[in-house]
């Protein structure tokens, strides 16, 4: 409980920084889970640079983009009713999710040194499956998130659920 209270105080004092650092930390954790539990690399074969890249993407891309998106979404649909939550989820999943994945996957490919041609081929191969998999998890999570969770906690809630999603994304993005 003391850790949670400290997190809440930090979030109140420095909301943007804490949200971005939370996203980065949990993206890094997702990659560790991907490498150790999904890919079963073992500690000797663990690619620390890859984990650092994913954590950096969390801080430099995921945290700012998703955190900013939630602010925009709350301005576009300011209410907190069930209908408002449904509208937010539909806009999030119908508009934002495809755009986010369409940027995230090639960004990882670029950071991994893929050529533009290879990156495009990888995006065409991986995007449909990643988007379909997204729709198995995120609509229900986001509906609850938009209805039950205050704006300043949404990114943290999503990133906690996203540890598993990040493991999947890391595996998908690093699979050649």
UniProtKB/Swiss-Prot annotation:
GO molecular function, one term: channel activity
Transmembrane segments: 18-38, 53-73, 94-114, 131-151
InterPro entries, per database record: Mpv17_PMP22 (IPR007248)
UniProt-annotated location(s): Mitochondrion inner membrane
Keyword Ubl conjugation assigned: no
Top-rank taxon: Eukaryota
Protein's membrane topology: Multi-pass membrane protein
Record-annotated site: Determines ion selectivity: 92
Disulfide bonds listed in the record: none
One Pfam family linked to the record: Mpv17_PMP22
GO biological process, alphabetically ordered: regulation of mitochondrial DNA metabolic process
Gene Ontology cellular-component annotations: cytoplasm; mitochondrial inner membrane; mitochondrion
Keywords, alphabetical: Membrane, Mitochondrion, Mitochondrion inner membrane, Transmembrane, Transmembrane helix
The protein's role, per its UniProt record: Non-selective channel that modulates the membrane potential under normal conditions and oxidative stress, and is involved in mitochondrial homeostasis. Involved in mitochondrial deoxynucleoside triphosphates (dNTP) pool homeostasis and mitochondrial DNA (mtDNA) maintenance. May be involved in the regulation of reactive oxygen species metabolism and the control of oxidative phosphorylation.
Family membership: Belongs to the peroxisomal membrane protein PXMP2/4 family.
UniProt protein name: Mitochondrial inner membrane protein Mpv17
Gene: MPV17
